[in-house]
């Protein structure tokens, strides 16, 4: 297991969620926090600790920095409707998130790598910013020259679908063509992340 994989497994156990397929397998065997006292019952947590952990869980699932998550919160406070729902919808339209949801990548880290290495097109143009927000109607696709690479051939066979959640309703995916279209704005209840978003809002609003 690589150092990165080991860190992801440890973080998964600490946060109580599986962040990668490998972490999922290990988490099923050892569903408790890492360390000498991981099996023991947690002490009663403060309200602050509970909300901090939810914020960390959301950050980890999208693989983003504290600055990026706070920016999503600030944007949500200026959006009509509930701040938490606006945050989730905004984060879910990140390019790296949609590359993962489509099954083109196996993990968030791999999705980000594909984008940064200029393998991903949006409406035919290379976009190398994982934080790029995809708009409804836009299509993401693996660059034709990259489609012969082994990772993308594996994805085109649908291999990652066995370890990822079902494709959400806001994506129209053609894996054989390594292509996906965001058909509409994601609804918070259909976004496949594990988080109490209200706790995250309360953490930042304190």
Curated annotation (Swiss-Prot):
Role according to the record: One of the primary rRNA binding proteins, it binds directly to 16S rRNA where it nucleates assembly of the body of the 30S subunit.
Domain S4 RNA-binding: 93-153
PROSITE patterns given in the database record: RIBOSOMAL_S4, S4
CDD domains: S4 (cd00165)
Regions that span the bilayer: none
GO cellular component: small ribosomal subunit
Entry keyword annotation includes Oxidoreductase: no
Gene Ontology molecular function, alphabetical: rRNA binding; structural constituent of ribosome
Protein family according to the UniProt entry: Belongs to the universal ribosomal protein uS4 family.
Source taxon at top rank: Bacteria
SUPFAM superfamilies: Alpha-L RNA-binding motif
Natural source organism: Bifidobacterium animalis subsp. lactis (strain AD011)
Keywords: Ribonucleoprotein, Ribosomal protein, RNA-binding, rRNA-binding
NCBIfam families, per the entry: PRK05327.1, rpsD_bact
Name of this protein: Small ribosomal subunit protein uS4
Gene Ontology BP terms: ribosomal small subunit biogenesis; translation
InterPro entries found in the cross-reference section: Ribosomal_uS4, Ribosomal_uS4_bac-type, Ribosomal_uS4_CS, Ribosomal_uS4_N, S4_RNA-bd, S4_RNA-bd_sf
Signal peptide: none
Complex and partners: Part of the 30S ribosomal subunit. Contacts protein S5. The interaction surface between S4 and S5 is involved in control of translational fidelity.
């Amino acid at each position: 297991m690589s150092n990165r994989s080991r860190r992801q497994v440890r973080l998964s156990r600490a946060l109580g969620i599986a962040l990668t397929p490998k972490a999922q397998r290990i988490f099923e065997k050892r569903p408790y926090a890492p360390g000498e006292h991981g099996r023991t019952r947690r002490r009663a947590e403060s309200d602050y600790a509970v909300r901090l952990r939810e914020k960390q869980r959301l950050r980890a699932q999208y693989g983003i920095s504290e600055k990026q998550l706070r920016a999503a919160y600030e944007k949500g406070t200026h959006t009509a409707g509930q701040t938490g729902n606006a945050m989730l919808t905004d984060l879910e339209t990140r390019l790296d998130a949609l590359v993962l949801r489509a099954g083109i990548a196996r993990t968030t880290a791999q999705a980000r790598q594909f984008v940064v290495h200029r393998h991903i097109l949006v409406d035919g143009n290379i976009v190398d910013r994982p934080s790029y927000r995809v708009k409804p109607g836009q299509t993401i696709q693996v660059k034709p020259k990259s489609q012969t690479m082994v990772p993308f051939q594996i994805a085109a066979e649908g291999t990652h679908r066995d370890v990822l959640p079902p494709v959400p309703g806001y994506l129209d995916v053609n894996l054989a063509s390594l292509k996906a279209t965001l058909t509409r704005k994601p609804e918070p209840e259909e976004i496949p992340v594990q988080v109490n978003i209200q706790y995250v809002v309360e953490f930042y609003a304190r």
